[in-house]
């Protein structure tokens, strides 16, 4: 949920909608869910079913990319709902964990590579 503090002002600046992606069980109403692997198990992420429409252009923003599991699962949900991922943006990228390669996107931006 730390990505919210970056994503909300970016959405405001771009004059576009802000859609929440949260760990499973934290969003109200009907959601779609994707599961992903962690080093120590599995987890899930959800987006509300009506938050993204066919053809919406989506920038996925988070505070950190490590292994890329959360970002890849979020991207899968966006595409399942009909959205088009324009780019991924992160404050911090832990380059030794290879998350950017795991996502398999041509457009990944991070401010700090550590």
Where are these regions (language model features)?
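PRPP-dependent phosphoribosyltransferase catalytic core
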Residues: 72-114
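Short, glycine/charge-rich flexible loops or terminal/linker lids adjacent to PRPP-binding catalytic cores
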Residues: 16-58
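Conserved G/P- and acidic residue-centered "switch" motifs that form tight phosphate/ATP-binding loops
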Residues: 63, 68
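Short Gly/Thr/Asp-enriched flexible loops that form oxyanion-binding sites at enzyme active sites
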Residues: 5-14, 75
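Short, well-ordered secondary-structure micro-motifs
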Residues: 8-9, 30-32, 98-101
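A short helix-loop-beta submotif of the ANL/AMP-binding
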Residues: 14-17, 83
């Amino acid at each position: 949920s730390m990505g919210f503090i970056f994503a909300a002002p970016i959405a405001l600046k771009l004059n576009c909608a802000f859609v929440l992606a949260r760990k499973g069980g934290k969003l109200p109403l009907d959601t779609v869910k994707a599961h992903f692997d962690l080093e120590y198990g599995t987890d899930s992420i959800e987006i509300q079913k009506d938050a993204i429409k066919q053809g919406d252009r989506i920038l996925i923003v988070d505070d950190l990319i490590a292994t890329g599991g959360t970002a890849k699962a979020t991207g899968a949900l966006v595409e399942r709902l009909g959205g088009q991922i324009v780019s991924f943006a992160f404050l911090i990228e832990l380059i030794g964990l290879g998350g950017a390669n795991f996502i398999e996107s041509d457009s990944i931006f991070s401010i700090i590579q550590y």
